[in-house]
């Protein structure tokens, strides 16, 4: 379970209404939301449709605050969301940024993100589920609760499954305490669609559905370079070409997980580079210690027609 706290202070927007008018540009700037959106743009490669939706939601919330300042009706917005898409497409990262935005605008008190799965909510025996679920909700209050692979909460084929108890508690809190908690349900799009069909209570409480597309090959190559640079590594020119080929081949294999697959592949490349340098002996400068060679990339089983190590293993249903 992940519990990430943000450092942004909770404060009302410091804008002044003069003669019944507001400077929306100043209001937006003073909210610090542009900073969070810029971080989202710079920190996440691709995902243009997702960034657009987050920008729309942020703008709607800022305008809602402006309406309040001028005495217009601005009821509490429903902010529960559904993030759908394949693994490794940035859903958790965007959820954390959304928590920061909501906190800065005063829609949640603390602005932290609590990330959970079914195992964190559902017990294994009678009387175990309610305390587990309520404890998680208590920890998430004032922030955002992110439930990954939310459809695993619902297992109608098992009459003795306790997931339904967790669902009922969640639905009640999402309705009655929506001014103090935002819930984001995440998972594969097709499974989430079936989950909502079987649980209309969730569908009626979700205001924003955001689909996270798979990354393009070029975007994954750029992600690999960025991840390497963040760890003080670079690819040789030949290795960059090999990375492009790796991405194209790896995408066709089972359990491909977008950026997660790239991160895991990079970890293996670094291991190969370390072994290569260790076995070579002799002197090594900064360039040698930080450069991933073509051989470090092509040593992957992907290039031999084999199956790369699994990057994502979904739960069994």
Curated annotation (Swiss-Prot):
InterPro entries: AAA+_ATPase (IPR003593), AAA_lid_6 (IPR041627), ATPase_AAA_core (IPR003959), CbxX/CfqX_mono (IPR000470), CbxX/CfxQ (IPR000641), CbxX/CfxQ_RuBisCO_ESX (IPR050773), P-loop_NTPase (IPR027417). Keywords: ATP-binding, Nucleotide-binding. It comes from the Bacteria. Pfam families: AAA, AAA_lid_6. CDD domains: AAA. The keyword Nucleotide-binding applies. GO terms for molecular function: ATP binding; ATP hydrolysis activity. Gene3D superfamilies: 1.10.8.60, P-loop containing nucleotide triphosphate hydrolases (3.40.50.300). ATP binds at residues 85-92. Necessary for the expression of RuBisCO. Belongs to the CbxX/CfxQ family. This is Protein CfxQ. The lineage of its organism: Bacteria, Pseudomonadati, Pseudomonadota, Alphaproteobacteria, Hyphomicrobiales.
């Amino acid at each position: 379970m992940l519990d990430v706290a943000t450092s942004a202070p909770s404060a009302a927007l410091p804008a002044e209404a003069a003669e019944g008018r507001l400077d929306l540009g100043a209001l937006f700037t003073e909210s610090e939301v542009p900073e969070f959106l810029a971080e989202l743009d710079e920190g996440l490669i691709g995902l243009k449709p997702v960034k657009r939706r987050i920008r729309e939601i942020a703008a709607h919330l800022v305008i809602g605050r402006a309406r309040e300042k001028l005495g217009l009706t601005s009821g509490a917005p429903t902010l529960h969301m559904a993030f759908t898409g394949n693994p490794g497409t940035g859903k958790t990262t965007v959820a954390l940024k959304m928590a920061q935005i909501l906190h800065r605008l005063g829609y949640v008190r603390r602005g932290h993100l609590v990330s959970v799965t079914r195992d964190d909510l559902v017990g294994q025996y009678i009387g175990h589920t309610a305390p587990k679920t309520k404890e998680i909700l208590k920890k998430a209050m004032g922030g955002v609760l992110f439930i990954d692979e939310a459809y695993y909460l619902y297992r109608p084929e098992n009459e003795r499954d306790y997931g339904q108890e967790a669902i009922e508690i969640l639905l009640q809190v999402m309705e009655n305490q929506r001014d103090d908690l935002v819930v984001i349900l995440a998972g594969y799009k097709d499974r989430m669609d079936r989950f909502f069909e079987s649980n209309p209570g969730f569908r009626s409480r979700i205001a924003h559905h955001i689909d996270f597309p798979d990354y393009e090959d070029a975007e994954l190559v750029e992600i690999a370079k960025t991840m390497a640079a963040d760890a003080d590594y670079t690819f040789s020119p030949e290795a960059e070409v090999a990375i492009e080929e790796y991405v194209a081949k790896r995408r066709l294999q089972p359990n491909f997980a977008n950026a997660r697959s790239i991160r895991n592949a990079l970890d293996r490349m670094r291991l190969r580079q370390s072994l290569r340098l260790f076995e070579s002996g002799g002197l090594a400068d900064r360039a040698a210690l930080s450069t991933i060679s073509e051989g470090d990339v092509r040593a992957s089983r992907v290039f031999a027609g084999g199956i790369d190590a699994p990057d994502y293993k979904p739960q069994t249903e």
